[in-house]
Amino acid sequence: MKILLAIALMLSTVMWVSTQQPQEVHTYCGRHLARTMADLCWEEGVDKRSDAQFASYGSAWLMPYSAGRGIVDECCLRPCSVDVLLSYC
């Protein structure tokens, strides 16, 4: 029983540490951006993000910070992480 508890504690510690690692950022432009998006969004399909889901609130502060920018602004003009790319899937 103590061994199982020790293993569970060790696994949870490893998982917590892995989530604390900073994500690597890169710039993605042109074909490289298109291919990366195709690879990341393969199962979901690549759909353009829409602000329609936020339109009913009517308050600008409820919209996400990046709502007015596109993927090129976020990932070509500046480096971005895979999490940012995935938010566009």
UniProtKB/Swiss-Prot annotation:
As stated in the Swiss-Prot or TrEMBL entry, residues carrying the post-translational modification Pyrrolidone carboxylic acid are: Q20
Localization recorded for this chain is: Secreted
Alphabetical GO CC annotations of the entry are: extracellular space
Q: Which UniProt keywords apply?
A: Cleavage on pair of basic residues, Disulfide bond, Hormone, Pyrrolidone carboxylic acid, Secreted, Signal
- Cysteine pairs forming cystine bridges in this chain are C29-C76, C41-C89, C75-C80
A GO MF term: growth factor activity
Query: What main location does UniProt list?
Result: secreted
Q: Which residues form the propeptide?
A: 50-68
Q: Iron among the record's keywords?
A: no
Position of the signal peptide = 1-19
Mind telling me which InterPro entries this protein's record contains? Bombyxin (IPR017097), Bombyxin_A (IPR030680), Insulin-like (IPR016179), Insulin-like_sf (IPR036438), Insulin_CS (IPR022353), Insulin_family (IPR022352)
Q: Which Gene3D superfamilies match?
A: Insulin-like
- What is the annotated quaternary arrangement, including any partners? Heterodimer of a B chain and an A chain linked by two disulfide bonds.
What else the UniProt entry mentions is: Silk worm has two kinds of PTTH: 4K-PTTH and 22K-PTTH; there are many forms of 4K-PTTH.
What family is this protein classified in? Answer: Belongs to the insulin family.
Role? Brain peptide responsible for activation of prothoracic glands to produce ecdysone in insects.
Name this protein carries in UniProt: Bombyxin A-2
Q: Which organism is it from?
A: Bombyx mori
